[in-house]
Regions:
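Glycine- and charged-residue-rich phosphate/anionic-cofactor binding loop of Rossmann-like
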Residues: 255, 272-289
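Conserved SAM-binding loop
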Residues: 1-2
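C-terminal capping/lid region of NAD(P)-dependent oxidoreductase domains
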Residues: 74-75, 101-105, 299-328
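Predominantly a Rossmann-like dinucleotide-binding segment in NAD(P)-dependent oxidoreductases
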Residues: 75, 82-180, 304
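Hydrophobic residues in well-ordered beta-strands that form the structural core
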Residues: 11, 51, 76-78, 201, ...
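Contiguous beta-strand/loop segments that form the cofactor/metal-binding neighborhood of enzyme cores
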Residues: 147-238, 264-280, 295, 310-328
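Beta-loop-alpha module in the N-terminal Rossmann-like domain of NAD(P)-dependent dehydrogenases
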Residues: 5-68
Length: 328
């Protein structure tokens, strides 16, 4: 890679890289169970960190990352791409303005018909082994939809979680053996928050179904479907369904309201925050609660009952991989 892109400096030891005093920030783009040790080492070395999703391979490790961020006074940004779509921006403005009224239920839906990494033909085998990934469909894709809803709702604290995970459909036996496939391809859950708010979670890497309807938000005055974005309400006692001109919104933001563009893409937002042009969105906090929900579904499935968020916090353990010669 260094030769291909003419990168002059290359390292075999991450600690040596982090000793450089001319580096302000690093990007951690590794397998999930490597996120925590490298991120923590970078934060302790005085660097700001941009980390891939999910935050870590377990809630325990994600929390350690968050604590280190606070301790070191550095920025930690998690790649939560769905926070920066125009759909999300429009929905956020409507929710903050009270257009939906009291929000009481949301649905987080992610769908692939036959899209399991490696066994269905793309991606590396580490995606489907918990020793490297920590989880399956929930960790890989569910993180986007759950975090999007948490952001829109103001990142409420989960109270109770119930759910089940599944691996039911056939796959290539040779690739199953090579990858040691041991993660879920489908997950379903229900999350309770304060004041009666609930979240339904459905996430599929592989399912015999032609489509899911996508994520949605239900309020006392109106409801939103998020992709494609539509608004549903009663107007003068008549049912109304409305769509949005996203292309016009994109054009107007890029020409008239150019300052909004720092919130339209994760890395652009990160760079702007590093340059002091905008405050960083609380992606670390949102990703931490997302991880709590995901691990809660796993724990609930193992115990076949609803669990509290406190149980998840107390039982979560580190599954970080050992990295030789890494100091943190």
């Amino acid at each position: 890679m260094c030769e291909k892109y003419n990168i002059p400096d290359k390292y075999e030891n991450i600690t040596e890289l982090l000793k450089r005093d001319d580096i302000d920030a690093v990007d951690v783009c590794l397998h999930n169970c490597l996120h925590a040790p490298v991120t923590i080492a970078a934060l302790r070395a005085g660097k700001h960190v941009y980390c891939e999703k999910p935050m870590a391979g377990s809630y325990h490790d994600a929390l350690e990352m968050y604590k280190t961020m606070k301790e070191m006074g550095k920025m930690l940004h998690i790649q939560l791409a769905w926070l920066y779509t125009w759909n999300t921006a429009i929905a956020k403005s409507m929710i903050d303005a009270g257009d939906l009224g009291h929000i009481y239920h949301v649905r987080s839906n992610g769908y692939r018909r036959r899209g399991r990494p490696y066994v269905d033909g793309y991606g590396r085998k580490e995606f489907v082994n918990t020793e490297w990934s920590g989880g399956g469909a929930l960790f890989d894709m569910g993180v986007y939809y759950i975090s999007q809803l948490l952001y829109l709702l103001g990142n409420p604290e989960p109270l109770r979680i119930a759910g089940h995970i599944y691996q039911e459909t056939d796959m290539d036996p040779r690739r199953r053996e090579i990858s040691r496939y041991n993660v879920e391809e489908f997950a379903a859950g229900l999350v309770d928050f304060a004041e009666g708010l609930t979240m339904n979670v459905t996430e599929a890497w592989a399912v015999h179904m032609d489509r899911f309807e996508g994520s949605c938000i239900m309020g006392s005055k109106g409801g939103l479907r998020l992709d494609p974005l539509s608004f549903h309400t009663n107007l003068h006692d008549y049912q109304m369904d409305a769509t949005f001109d996203e292309d016009a919104a994109k054009y107007r933001d890029s020409t008239v309201y150019s300052e909004r563009m720092v919130y339209r893409e994760s890395q652009r937002h990160w760079i702007a925050a590093l340059q002091g042009k905008c405050p960083l969105l609380p992606t670390a906090e949102i990703a931490l609660n997302t991880q709590l929900i995901q691990e809660g579904i796993y724990l609930s499935s193992r115990q076949n009952r609803q669990v509290t968020s406190q149980e998840v916090k107390e039982t979560s353990q580190s599954n970080s991989r050992f990295i030789p010669n890494l100091e943190y």
